[in-house]
């Protein structure tokens, strides 16, 4: 295990100073992610944990810990309860829909956004009637992955358009009311 309490290991936010990660220089093992739900963080570094005693997530961020590999396994994706999948699918679909409002995207970003929306839209419409269909969950997971990749490649997160303020609000609501 790591030395320190979760509060000592999470990203620190000292007053009037920049945030820093106490774990940044620690040795790292390769990370292999096998997600249970579609989420746009599967290929990102770090993680966030909800703590009911705090008004924000406990963040554990380290840019050196981007996953080495991501595996989408049907059985693992089917292990999530319908309520959880419905929630994450709604988040993925809303994110892909809002990305279509962005303008002046480079062709690679636009292609990822369009493919992510196509996958999410087709799967989302059928999901609750075919809750045990692994192909729909894989499509939603791929949509989330493509959406995240597009945001990384575009170097902006909902920087403009009618949905530009929704991300922060929806994240706060999702953390507060899971």
Annotate each language-model stretch with its function:
Residues 4-108:
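A glycine/threonine-rich phosphate-anchoring loop and its flanking beta-alpha core
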Residues 1:
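A phosphate-binding catalytic loop at a beta-strand-loop-alpha-helix junction
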Residues 99-178:
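Active-site segments that bind and position negatively charged phosphate/pyrophosphate groups
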């Amino acid at each position: 295990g790591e030395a320190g309490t979760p509060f000592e290991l999470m990203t620190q936010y000292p007053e009037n100073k920049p945030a820093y990660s106490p774990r940044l220089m620690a040795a790292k093992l390769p990370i292999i992610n096998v997600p249970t739900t579609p989420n746009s963080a599967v290929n990102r570094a770090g993680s966030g944990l909800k703590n009911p005693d705090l008004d924000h997530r406990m963040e554990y961020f380290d840019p050196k810990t981007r996953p080495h590999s991501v595996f989408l396994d049907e059985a693992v994706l089917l292990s999530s309860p319908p309520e959880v999948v419905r929630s994450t699918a709604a988040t993925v679909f809303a994110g892909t829909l809002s990305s279509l409002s962005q303008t002046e995207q480079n062709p690679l970003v636009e292609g990822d956004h369009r493919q992510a929306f196509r996958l999410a839209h087709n799967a989302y419409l059928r999901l609750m009637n075919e809750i045990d269909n692994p192909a729909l969950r894989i499509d939603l997971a791929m949509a989330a992955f493509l959406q995240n990749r597009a945001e990384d490649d575009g170097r902006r997160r909902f920087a403009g358009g009618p949905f530009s303020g929704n991300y922060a609000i929806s994240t706060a609501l999702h953390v507060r009311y899971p």
